[in-house]
């Protein structure tokens, strides 16, 4: 889960799985983007005090964008939109949801304003219905729902409003303000996401298998794809231990890299300064450069 009250946050190409509650929850933020993240296999019947709790995430914020993410194999909260004051101008677009259990998206109370546009829904073995959204129970949320695709269900694809549980007349006819993205039609987003989502630079065997099952429409792990323990998907891998580069000031940037770019290997404070680029901190430049290797 993300900390509250943060601003100007971006989460990109993250793979996250095996939580005892939500796998990826972030809200009460301002200017947030979550993109190209692979969110899979929360643990349903695990050690949560409330019992079964295999949930995808609580997503929200003020001026928050969620695009090109994949939620797969969660019983519910695919996602849940946060029901707190300030959940406004949330744009949920070009995401893929696969093999939900009893609920896809819901929430957004306390006067939430949410766009759900151009997402791709693929029912799996555990999916109990073809709904897109259950509006918030307090009846104060407002939702623009359009251009979403429900694979295998032309009725829902052609008229999204048929797949919304809305007894409060919460649907609106025009989208709320949002920051534009490089938007795809849903089926194109689906194929792009399967190719690029998560830690795609070097995928582990677990991520590869999850994506294979999404593509094939399978749910062989656990009960129809809903799991209770990491052991059901192979368990924690044994990772090779590498040799870390020397980092004298423990600022996250190796000495050899700092010297190459004219930084001080004995000064930890330069990690958060803008010596190398006016828009990005030095440690961001270092981390982004790792992708070039």
What are these regions (language model features)?
Residues 57, 132-135, 265:
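Short clusters of hydrophobic/aromatic residues that line enzyme substrate/ligand-binding pockets
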Residues 4, 17, 27, 85, ...:
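Solvent-exposed, acidic/flexible segments
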Residues 83-231:
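Extracellular beta-rich repeat passengers
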Residues 231-293:
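Extracellular calcium-associated, cysteine-rich motifs in secreted modular proteins
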């Amino acid at each position: 889960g993300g900390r509250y009250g943060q601003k100007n946050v971006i989460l990109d190409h993250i793979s996250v799985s095996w939580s005892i509650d939500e796998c990826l929850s972030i809200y009460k933020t301002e200017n947030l983007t979550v993109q190209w993240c692979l969110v899979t296999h929360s643990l349903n019947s695990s050690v949560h005090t409330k019992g079964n709790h295999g949930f995808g995430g609580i997503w929200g914020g003020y001026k928050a964008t969620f695009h090109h993410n994949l939620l797969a194999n969660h019983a519910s909260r695919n996602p849940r939109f946060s029901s707190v004051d300030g959940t406004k101008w949330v744009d949920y677009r070009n995401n893929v949801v696969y093999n939900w259990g009893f609920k896809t998206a819901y929430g957004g109370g306390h006067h939430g304003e949410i766009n759900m546009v151009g997402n791709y829904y693929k029912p799996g073995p555990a999916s109990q219905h073809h709904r897109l959204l259950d509006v918030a129970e307090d009846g104060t949320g407002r939702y623009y729902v359009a251009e979403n695709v429900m694979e295998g269900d032309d009725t829902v694809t052609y008229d999204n409003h048929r797949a919304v549980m809305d007894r409060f007349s919460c649907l609106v006819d025009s989208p709320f303000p949002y920051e534009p993205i490089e938007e795809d039609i849903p089926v194109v987003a689906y194929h792009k996401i399967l190719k690029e989502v998560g830690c795609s630079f070097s995928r582990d065997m677990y991520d590869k298998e999850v994506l294979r099952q999404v593509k094939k429409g399978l749910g062989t792990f656990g009960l129809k794809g809903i799991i209770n323990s990491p052991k059901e998907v192979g368990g924690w891998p044994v990772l090779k231990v590498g040799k870390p580069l020397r980092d004298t000031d423990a600022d996250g940037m190796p000495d050899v890299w700092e010297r190459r770019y004219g930084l001080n290997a004995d000064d930890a404070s330069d990690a958060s300064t803008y010596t190398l680029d006016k828009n990005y901190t030095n440690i961001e430049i270092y981390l982004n450069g790792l992708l070039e290797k």
